[in-house]
Amino acid sequence: MSLSLWQQCLARLQDELPATEFSMWIRPLQAELSDNTLALYAPNRFVLDWVRDKYLNNINGLLTSFCGADAPQLRFEVGTKSVTQTPQAAVTSNVAAPAQVAQTQPQRAAPSTRSGWDNVPAPAEPTYRSNVNVKHTFDNFVEGKSNQLARAAARQVADNPGGAYNPLFLYGGTGLGKTHLLHAVGNGIMARKPNAKVVYMHSERFVQDMVKALQNNAIEEFKRYYRSVDALLIDDIQFFANKERSQEEFFHTFNALLEGNQQIILTSDRYPKEINGVEDRLKSRFGWGLTVAIEPPELETRVAILMKKADENDIRLPGEVAFFIAKRLRSNVRELEGALNRVIANANFTGRAITIDFVREALRDLLALQEKLVTIDNIQKTVAEYYKIKVADLLSKRRSRSVARPRQMAMALAKELTNHSLPEIGDAFGGRDHTTVLHACRKIEQLREESHDIKEDFSNLIRTLSS
């Protein structure tokens, strides 16, 4: 028995798990096999607890299937075993950076060449403008299924910057919490190392700084500034589109930071490869570390966000009122918080209690607009156009995959985005039974966890229907 056993486990886990989960939780593990014990080393306690909780049965099952009664005992520890680290070759390129890209990736400096996070020096001139908002922390970020992986990845980076998830690329629609997580990482890093040089900025600020540097003949100072930070957090990287000189400079900055094991975190409103106007060499580098999506929050998370926001404002928000608002406003966190602020302001001005009837009155124009925008008819037309089929196909009895999957998607969206009951949704889809609708909703929920494509389709359609 040898470490090839762990490589076999890796190959199977890669097939069984979504790519993001595999890259985030399994890839960082290091393995050591001795005395019929397979020790798996996690980079920190957070990863160890997560893997043991979520994947212990998967791994034990694979060991038994490969070895039968001779399967080794499994042991988890926090630490590193560099000589037995999970081989990169053990997994295929749909999770790692593509082989042809990996050949061009700059060689990262060995840990011994940079004291880095174990000995962050005192800030030097010029003074670094952190721009990190101290109000945005992990503690006040409401976690749900839609953002669980993104939060976990950000937490990992805050605890171990410059480590396995470098760069970290977060993407999703407007107002879903990407910026909050950027600031939370910055605050987490500086809480651990107060002298760390952490810089947060919008991508347009990088462009503006570069233009000023060119105008003032100070491009070398510009390069030194950005290439000497310990963590660079850039929001809305899609604004680099069609700015060739900015992309050129960021390309070299990116390489320099990666070589120095300095952390990079980027956000965008879309998947890296879908960003138009950005060079392929940059888009490929964006995917070298870990890419995680943030989806629109599900109902339970929307309710939790409203309750937490109300609590922060010392406002008692009845649960049924939070549910009423969350059920009708679905697009993003910013919209939810804006609606709640409006309700609170109206309550303060009028002195009235916050009830469902009061909310209906305070948000009447917003609620009317939402109900006008999202109807089952609109969902059917949007889904049919997205999948390049006819609305009549969605209502038909056809069961081919090319029709059945879009039909299930449309039903799931109708349940998520409208207030119609399951029987009403079934009637709108050719008189189908409510159990068919329930099955469709559960199937799409399952596929969103297993398939990147289905997850992307759902997010894209939600974004289109909510805009």
From Swiss-Prot:
Pfam family, one: Bac_DnaA_C
Keyword match DNA-binding: yes
CDD domains documented for this protein: AAA, Bac_DnaA_C
Chain segments carrying region Domain IV, binds dsDNA: 348-467
Gene3D superfamilies per the UniProt record, alphabetical: 1.10.1750.10, 1.10.8.60, 3.30.300.180, P-loop containing nucleotide triphosphate hydrolases
One GO biological process term: DNA replication initiation
Keywords: ATP-binding, Cytoplasm, DNA replication, DNA-binding, Lipid-binding, Nucleotide-binding
Signal sequence range: none
Region of interest: Domain I, interacts with DnaA modulators: 1-90
Region feature (Domain III, AAA+ region): 131-347
InterPro entries assigned to the protein according to its UniProt record, in alphabetical order: AAA+_ATPase, Chromosome_initiator_DnaA, Chromosome_initiator_DnaA-like, Chromosome_initiator_DnaA_CS, DnaA_C, DnaA_dom, DnaA_N_dom, DnaA_N_sf
Example GO molecular function: DNA replication origin binding
Sequence segments annotated as region (Domain II): 91-130
Compartments, as annotated in UniProt: Cytoplasm
Binding positions (ATP): 175, 177-179
Compositionally biased spans, kind Low complexity: 97-111
GO cellular component, as recorded: cytoplasm; plasma membrane
The protein's assembly and partners: Oligomerizes as a right-handed, spiral filament on DNA at oriC.
Family (UniProt): Belongs to the DnaA family.
Domain notes: Domain I is involved in oligomerization and binding regulators, domain II is flexibile and of varying length in different bacteria, domain III forms the AAA+ region, while domain IV binds dsDNA.
HAMAP family linked to this entry: DnaA_bact
Known function: Plays an essential role in the initiation and regulation of chromosomal replication. ATP-DnaA binds to the origin of replication (oriC) to initiate formation of the DNA replication initiation complex once per cell cycle. Binds the DnaA box (a 9 base pair repeat at the origin) and separates the double-stranded (ds)DNA. Forms a right-handed helical filament on oriC DNA; dsDNA binds to the exterior of the filament while single-stranded (ss)DNA is stabiized in the filament's interior.
Protein name: Chromosomal replication initiator protein DnaA
